[in-house]
Amino acid sequence: RDLVRSRGLGDVYKRQGMGGGTGTGAAPVVAKLAKDMGILTVGVVTKPFRFEAKTRMMNAIGGISKIKENVDTLIVIPNDKLLEIVDRRTTMPEALKKADEVLQQAVQGITDLINLPALINLDFADVQTVMTDKGIAHIGIGEAKGDDKALEAVQQAVSSPLLETTIKGATHVIINISGDISLMDANDAASYVQELSLIHI
């Protein structure tokens, strides 16, 4: 039920919490079916908290390894990262809701690349080139306003607190910029990412 297929785009996104029987067992199977059909397949998964049962973490690590073999791109969100952004009064349901929001943002961010107008519009072929057979990925979303809004937004995007990845060493990058910004704003944002990833964008 968590499988999302975007009509007409030929891509499949699999959102899943790893560690339990359903996600760990089913996710790699669904991903393989999609990839075998030649469909761009993106996995977005969570790792359980370290305080959960050791077997659950071991299952999650094994499941992530299997799903990585059967998706083009994989985004991993460790639940432990929630401990860095919530206070002691945050309840477990509230914390898990934040993790789910990041999962949703990851999927939404990719579809928005194609569907929403931007300074330079992308099509599915652009996304496919960057995401096909690429392995672990980093994705982030930022939003800001004011004089340095573009730079502030991209700084938010590359430093997502709930991901264990960074863009350092990235071989491919897509930057999607939208809003009322100037050419210089867009250049500042792209230059910032280029310096961090040390690649040509």
Question: Can you describe what each PLM-predicted range is?
Answer:
Residues 11-19, 45-47, 138-140, 173-178:
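Short glycine-rich or small-residue beta-strand-to-loop segments that form or flank ligand, phosphate
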Residues 29-33, 60, 190-194:
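Short, solvent-exposed amphipathic alpha-helical segments in soluble enzyme
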Residues 11-14, 33-122, 126-131:
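N-terminal glycine-/lysine-enriched basic segments
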Residues 19-30, 52:
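Short glycine/serine/threonine-rich phosphate/pyrophosphate-binding segments
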